[in-house]
Curated annotation (Swiss-Prot):
It is found in: Cytoplasm. Its main location: cytoplasm. This is Uridylate kinase. Keywords: Allosteric enzyme, ATP-binding, Cytoplasm, Kinase, Nucleotide-binding, Pyrimidine biosynthesis, Transferase. It catalyses: UMP + ATP = UDP + ADP. The gene is pyrH. Its EC number is 2.7.4.22. One of its GO terms (molecular function) is ATP binding. Homohexamer. It comes from Ehrlichia chaffeensis (strain ATCC CRL-10679 / Arkansas). Catalyzes the reversible phosphorylation of UMP to UDP. The keyword Plastid does not apply. ATP binds at residues 17-20, 60, 64, 168-169, 174, 177.
């Protein structure tokens, strides 16, 4: 019996949001090869369960459009397009890491860059998933002023994912930053309404509102903990579920 058939999973198709900061590791800029290697092995384990896996990558480890606009007065729209190109670099790096561990993947970009990847088309992306390939979505939604968190919510909804996974540096949603406040309380579950009313900045309001409107749960967990993603897919591990 294969591992995929022997492993009972809670989800069959999921979207994972991978922030640029997560890929940066301790380097302070760019992609940490060790982080890419560890992440690719974690993704390979989940993929081996037969789970259809879609990723949306951020670009904050290379360039943040909003920050550049605020700090230097640069035009926000142009900065956001630069940020989209940063997500492309991360997506290609992640694709290489996955294929190094023998996991087939495809990068699909919201803006056409046909020399290096496919342009995102929903039906094409779903077909790749059905063929057992990991789909890596780059360039956000393809328009400025929208975050990659919003892109994650949008792609998760339109591709019919069972849940949207938000990988962070802590094991769920807390009432305050647990690294700064020892009294911070971790939630096992929290509603979209409470998340927004308490102003807990896990994802931006547009992303949370999209997921809420379409009743797609958001799972917040520690992406840096080896095996945590696979544990949750099996129904174990520490995480917070954001729900309607």
């Amino acid at each position: 019996m294969s591992e995929a058939s022997a492993t009972k999973v809670k989800y069959s198709r999921v979207l994972l949001k991978v922030s640029g900061e997560a890929l940066m590791g301790k380097k302070g800029f760019g992609c940490d090869i060790e982080v890419l290697d560890k992440l690719s092995h974690d993704l390979k384990e989940v993929h081996s369960f037969g789970v259809q896996l879609c990723l949306v990558v951020g670009g904050g480890n290379i360039f943040r459009g909003a920050s550049a606009s605020a700090s230097f007065g640069f035009e926000r729209a142009s900065n956001d397009y630069i940020g989209m190109l940063a997500t492309m670099m991360n997506a290609l790096s992640l694709q290489n890491a996955l294929e190094k561990v023998n996991v087939q993947s495809r990068v699909l970009s919201a803006i056409p860059i046909t020399a290096v990847c496919e342009t995102y088309i929903r039906r094409r992306a779903i077909r790749h998933l059905e063929k057992g390939r990991v789909v890596i979505c780059a360039a956000g939604v393809g328009s400025p002023f929208f975050t990659t968190d919003t892109a994650a919510a949008l792609r998760g909804i339109e591709m019919g994912c069972d849940a949207i996974f938000k990988g962070t540096q802590v094991d769920g949603v807390y009432s305050a930053d647990p690294k700064k406040n020892a009294d911070a309380v971790r939630y096992d579950k929290i509603s979209y309404r409470d998340l927004l009313s308490l102003d807990l900045k896990i994802m931006d309001v547009a992303a949370v509102s999209l997921a809420r409107e379409h009743s797609v749960p958001i799972i917040v967990f520690n992406l840096g903990q080896p095996g945590s993603f696979a544990d949750i897919i099996r129904g174990d591990g520490l995480y917070t579920t954001i729900y309607n």
